[in-house]
UniProtKB/Swiss-Prot annotation:
Listed InterPro entries: Complex1_LYR_LYRM7 (IPR045298), MZM1/LYRM7 (IPR050435)
Superkingdom of origin: Eukaryota
Function: Assembly factor required for Rieske Fe-S protein RIP1 incorporation into the cytochrome b-c1 (CIII) complex. Functions as a chaperone, binding to this subunit within the mitochondrial matrix and stabilizing it prior to its translocation and insertion into the late CIII dimeric intermediate within the mitochondrial inner membrane. Modulates the mitochondrial matrix zinc pool.
Subcellular location: Mitochondrion matrix
Gene Ontology MF, one: protein folding chaperone
GO biological process, one term: mitochondrial respiratory chain complex III assembly
Protein name: Mitochondrial zinc maintenance protein 1, mitochondrial
Keywords per UniProt: Chaperone, Mitochondrion, Transit peptide
Family the UniProt entry places it in: Belongs to the complex I LYR family. MZM1 subfamily.
Coiled coil: none
Assembly, per entry: Interacts with RIP1.
Chief location bin: mitochondrion
Positions of region (Disordered): 104-123
Length: 123
């Protein structure tokens, strides 16, 4: 029964991966093409269901999530000379799915007292 659901899950994971590449690499055709070719190659190598099929599907889903939420591309918009050095300016393509962290955890971490001479887990 599980083998019958794996092809549907694999197709779904493949489609999610293709959508994630389109979001992450929109406007950069060579990289988009290379990412999609690699995804196809990996799925073609795993065409026959096996013991590790669920792990490979999970890997594809996690890869799609990382591509969608953590990849930001930059394009060079100008090069200027400032102070005798070449300075490049880039525009970042941040989209609606890009994960934006907040600094609340970093700010809160600085408020804890530091224990000197004790391990991290000792009282």
């Amino acid at each position: 029964m599980a083998a019958a659901t794996n092809p549907v899950s694999a197709i779904s994971a493949y489609r999610q991966l293709l959508r994630a590449t389109r979001i992450a690499f929109n406007g950069d055709f060579p990289v988009l093409h290379a990412a999609r070719a690699e995804a196809r190659k990996q799925f073609d190598q795993s065409r026959q269901p096996g013991v590790d099929t669920p792990m490979k599907i999970q890997h594809a889903l996690e890869t799609a999530h990382i591509l969608r939420s953590n990849i930001v591309q930059g394009t060079k918009i100008e090069t200027k000379e400032e102070g005798g050095e070449q300075v490049d300016r880039y525009a970042l393509r941040i989209h609606e799915y890009t994960e934006r962290g907040d600094n609340d955890t970093i700010k809160a971490a600085g408020q804890k007292p530091v224990k000197v001479g004790k391990g991290c887990c000792s009282s």
